[in-house]
Amino acid sequence: HPLLKIANHSLIDLPTPSNISAWWNFGSLLGLCLVIQILTGLFLAMHYTSDTLTAFSSVTHICRDVNYGWLIRYLHANGASMFFICLYMHVGRGIYYGSYTYLETWNIGIILLFAVMATAFMGYVLPWGQMSFWGATVITNLLSAIPYIGTTLVEWIWGGFSVDKATLTRFFAFHFILPFIIAALVMVHLLFLHETGSNNPSGIPSNSDKIPFHPYYTIKDALGFLVLILLLLLLVLFSPDLLGDPDNYTPANPLNTPPHIKPEWYFLFAYAILRSIPNKLGGVLALIMSILVLAIIPFLHISKQRSMMFRPISQVLFWVLVADLLTLTWIGGQPVEHPFITIGQVASILYFSIILILMPLASLIENKILKW
């Protein structure tokens, strides 16, 4: 049967490298996150209303009156956090082990990253709290930095002259449909991956040593699922508001700006890069480039080795990059004052320098050391 054949060749008889580590678990974990988000989101949508007058109340109603509504709501909110943790780990794995040399798979991955970020942003607007409203206002307003068409574009997206009813309704519509587009893209992502098969930690072709996906990696994925669900439940049942902003428990008020407008933690690194450039258009470009720079990475790969496993200089740079991203995440949540401004600017410059200049340079040195 053709459908069973696809399932069999993707999940059961798939030849898989025998030495892939836990860093290869995040793909399936992202799949699990997507399923959790679609299911919890579907049940939330059954009780949510996307009108400015009732949106905030409908979320309160879900938490207070719907059976296990509080659980569904917090699973969905914190599920997004787990989604991004897995996403960043997955991308980091790709950079470390040179998986980006699978160009089609990598590029669809970048499109997926953008799609998930767009979905999360629009989802954050839906509860219609203070941070929802002002986050939507600030981020959509960035498009006005586009020369000539900017202002028209922003008003077109808003459906008026400010973030209002029309904006909320369309954001709900987009937030509902995007996850299904993401699911379709995931299939394409996997289709391209299965053309080549998985990479492995050594970066050396493993065609001579493949094992069937089932039972070896089905059981390994199942363990990953259990760990993810455990962590998600710990978050949801013990401190569901740990990662949220208390301002979002205040209903949206266009006449009152919150003291610190900031996105959810998973966007803070990009927000810090955006703010560290004292020019609107420049900031927007830096913001887009902070993710789009991933598309350039494959073309800067000049090392004779694929993986960083045996490249100590590149390894150090990689972990400095991780530390730098954590620094940017911290700065994104701080007010725009001394010394945070300078730290943010240094961290932003370092971010692009490591990826575009220092890593290729390190590869060059490593090639020389190995007399290649």
UniProtKB/Swiss-Prot annotation:
Presence of the UniProt keyword DNA repair in the record: no
Pfam families xref list: Cytochrom_B_C, Cytochrome_B
Cofactor entry: heme b
Keywords: Electron transport, Heme, Iron, Membrane, Metal-binding, Mitochondrion, Mitochondrion inner membrane, Respiratory chain, Transmembrane, Transmembrane helix, Transport, Ubiquinone
Chief location: mitochondrion
Residues annotated for heme b b566 binding in this entry: H90, H189
Spans through the membrane: 26-46, 70-91, 106-126, 171-191, 219-239, 281-301, 313-333, 340-360
GO biological-process terms attached to the record: mitochondrial electron transport, ubiquinol to cytochrome c
Alphabetical list of InterPro entries matching this protein: Cyt_b/b6_C, Cyt_b/b6_C_sf, Cyt_b/b6_N, Cytb/b6-like_sf, Cytochrome_b, Cytochrome_b_C_euk/bac, Cytochrome_b_N_euk/bac, Di-haem_cyt_TM
Localization (cell): Mitochondrion inner membrane
Similarity-based family: Belongs to the cytochrome b family.
Extra remark: Heme 1 (or BL or b562) is low-potential and absorbs at about 562 nm, and heme 2 (or BH or b566) is high-potential and absorbs at about 566 nm.
Protein name: Cytochrome b
Record organism: Sylvilagus transitionalis
Lineage: Eukaryota, Metazoa, Chordata, Craniata, Vertebrata
